[in-house]
Amino acid sequence: MITAIEITSRAPFVGGATFGEVGAYERLDGVAIGELDPAHPANRGIVNIDKAPRSAHGNVEYRSDICILRPADPERGNGRILYEVNNRGRTLLFANLCGGKAGNQPQTTADLGNALPLRLGFTLVWSGWDPGAPRANGGLGLDTPIATDNGAPIVRRIREEFISGTRGGELQQFRLNYEAATQDGAVLTVRRTQSAPRQPVAFEFVDARTVRLAQGTRPELGSIYELRYDATKPRVLGIGFAATRDIVSHLRNSATGRDLLGRQPTHALAFGISQAGRYLRDHLAQGFNRDEDGVRVFDGVFTHVAGIGRVFFNTEFAQPARTRTWHEDHGFPEVEFPFATGELLRGDDTKVIETNTSTEYWQKGASLLHTDPDGTRDVALPANVRGYYLPGTQHGGKAGMPRDAGPCTNPRNWHDPMPAIRALLVALDEWVVNGREPPPSRLPRIADGTLVRAEAVAWPKLASLVPPRAADDVVAPGDWTDPQPPSHAWQPLVPQVDADGNEIAGIRLPDIAVPRGTFTGWNLYKAPLPEGELADRDGTHLAFATTRSPDDPRPSLAERYPTHEAYRERIADVVAELQHDRLLLEEDAAACLARAQD
């Protein structure tokens, strides 16, 4: 439960700017202080909570950063909470959903993009859930206790993986998730790909949380460095689930929450992108969508680009920032059978929308959300779940994505799926508040041939289009500290394509339905990264030729669209259909039509 919320800063948001009929917003920053009874049934599933130090009341204490954006006049808001789960301490709502520039500290309205959630009148809430999340630049963190064995340090041999230049900049040294109990016996190896043999590497400890290669050497770009060492001081990470649960429940149901928000919220929705979406899947699966009194926390949950993943979190010495793709983070526990969303809900009737892109089918086993584990038949979703596929889109797709090749073989995918996500967020809100059902699920299916094995995808014959060897495996989790060959693997499937190489099923936004090129959710690395390996998150865009080319079997732009007016008419038809199906908001429809004029 929450014992106090201490507000340390309260100010007009972005200079008192107004957002439609809702008007101005206030920003409140502070700390939520909570404590948990380890014996309470709602908390017993938290790993090592029984090994955490206790307060004078016999409870386990925690402190979470919290940020609230509330209408300055609460009665002009819609009376509902939209809680965004942060991604490694970062808020993504404005930068991704809204097409803005903001990180955690927006300063101007330009940082907020279209500011849709504010114009809709939501009270926005963020809080810390990961003790390892960086707090720099306004990052949101959580303070939890260190577990011990009756006061003695817990020490365990664990494994960590580091790769320079793929998910971030070049690494000069490696920062460990945990403190090394001893430097003795630690072993560092390197391999170029997941299947290559490990080779020992000389290294040294800089301090108990940092290692580097021997003086004069730097990590090879893209190679997999693996450290095995004796770690100590594991925090009780699973408290993060309880912190989210208790903060939202407190804001919804307590007098303190009413005073902070200016009114009693009627409903609460949760939204999470990537890691944050996987966190929400795990939050549901582990039963944390009911508070200690059994009251539902979130009435609606929206996960975007989570695939079938959960988070490596409620485990001793867990590392929640890890996520498996073709080249990275194999052997860490992230997936857990059963995968289908209906199995996560544990009888909870919260309404769920899940959206995934092409990348999640190639890299994150997303097909297993709606097929049997062997990939032989489609499985129906429960009545309170909708699933939507965003074809021709990469994992991090949003407005303003780069179009050059970057670290990849092909030019990167710039398709923006967020117009559909915005429409579906509105649909989830309507579903929760007044029972208006959202559009039917739009997913690739085995039955109609739009979901197939990777080797059955009918790619057009292009010299520049070299498809992946396979989709990434989905395997049974084992001992993550010393992985062995998996005991079982499930069968992920991927979306089938048309003659242009564009995927057939799902919500085909105008750039896919009336294409000027081929969009995929995958790309391949080029040197100096491991050449030919499936890139971590990047997709591909291969533009059509302007006029007929003997080297390109795809019709040229001139053949498809004899006049600009013909192109505009086709865009208008697609926009009208998407609006009719409630998959495109009016403002986004107008923007699509305006772009088609260019």
Regions inferred by a protein language model and the residue ranges of each:
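C-terminal His-loop and adjacent cap/lid subdomain of alpha/beta-hydrolase
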Residues: 1-598
